[in-house]
Amino acid sequence: MPQFFRTQPLTDRTTSHGFAEVSSEDHCYCVWLVPAISSDIELRYRTFVDWAVCHKVDFEEMQLPTAPHITLARGIKLKPNQSFKSVLQYIASKRKSPLNIKFGKVAIGDSFYKRVYIQVEKTPGLEELQNAAYDLADTSDPFNVIEHPYMPVIYAKSICSDYSTSDPIETISSIGQASWGKACFLELIQLNKANHQGYVCDRIEFTV
């Protein structure tokens, strides 16, 4: 079975080998790119978590990602009993270019999972991974379509405060100013659309 993780920051997630279950409209599979725990960006994210917890009242039903990550794709289609690792291995095999991860500005989105996020430049390496992921995805549902990879930092239904001031913007922007590091993980996540809970199905490691 996949490993359950709560919507709490910095949960220690371990690989759990498994296979796809019967598909359901209640959940979808996503692909994340996650830095190593020892990376500068992970350490910077911990500082951000402290800030975010103190500003929880500024957001409606705020949740935090379990770790800093770049969301590449949603709606990955798996066949019954297909191994999670085989999906990740296929996606990783299509990358021919360096990832060369570059962050842009802090932005406010129009959905729960993209309420506050950091823009990510679609470099050739990231585009290769994303295109490979969408080879396996159902793009008929607009929810699944992600045109540009991004790093979500706050999940929420809405923002209840003015976030045009410099303090929150500088605090959130500091995450994108950190180094991603040389190693990272490609993860397959099973997401429950109703309660926003998820499972780490499997992960593979590769160099940037």
From Swiss-Prot:
GO CC list: clathrin-coated vesicle; cytosol; nucleus
One Pfam family hit: CPDase
GO terms of molecular function: 2',3'-cyclic-nucleotide 3'-phosphodiesterase activity
SUPFAM superfamilies according to UniProt: LigT-like (SSF55144)
Domain of life: Eukaryota
InterPro entries: Cyclic-nucl_3Pdiesterase (IPR012386), Cyclic_Pdiesterase (IPR009097)
A GO biological-process term: cyclic nucleotide metabolic process
Protein name (record): Uncharacterized protein UNK4,15
Species whose genome carries this gene: Schizosaccharomyces pombe (strain 972 / ATCC 24843) (Fission yeast)
